[in-house]
Amino acid sequence: MEAKFFCFLEIIGVGYKASTNAQGSILYLKLGFSHEIRLQVTPSVRVFCLKPNLICCTGMDHQKVTQFAAIVKSCKPPEVYKGKGIQYRNEIIHKKQGKKK
């Protein structure tokens, strides 16, 4: 049995979505920008969307899987005030407190 490595990414935010094409070679991200972000998936990594806000990256090489997940996360890192953006599934985001009057 071959060991596979998984990396789950959650997209948090109203209207933020992810999808792939039929072959799974291109990842489409709608992250609140005026355009859709297209990411070419590396051949050694397989990407699929379990839900519109949950991305699963899998592959045989742990370094390549986590590197691609980091590239996806860098498209929209989590905000420090509201927490919107892309984050790892078990990641804890420390939010800042807003202004006080």
UniProtKB/Swiss-Prot annotation:
Its main location: mitochondrion. One of its GO terms (cellular component) is ribosome. It comes from Marchantia polymorpha. PANTHER family: 60S/50S RIBOSOMAL PROTEIN L6/L9, RIBOSOMAL PROTEIN L6-RELATED. GO terms for biological process: translation. It is found in: Mitochondrion. Belongs to the universal ribosomal protein uL6 family. Gene3D superfamilies: Ribosomal protein L6, alpha-beta domain (3.90.930.12). It comes from the Eukaryota. Keywords: Mitochondrion, Ribonucleoprotein, Ribosomal protein. The keyword Mitochondrion applies. Signal peptide: none annotated. This is Large ribosomal subunit protein uL6m. The lineage of its organism: Eukaryota, Viridiplantae, Streptophyta, Embryophyta, Marchantiophyta. Pfam families: Ribosomal_L6 (PF00347). One of its GO terms (molecular function) is rRNA binding.
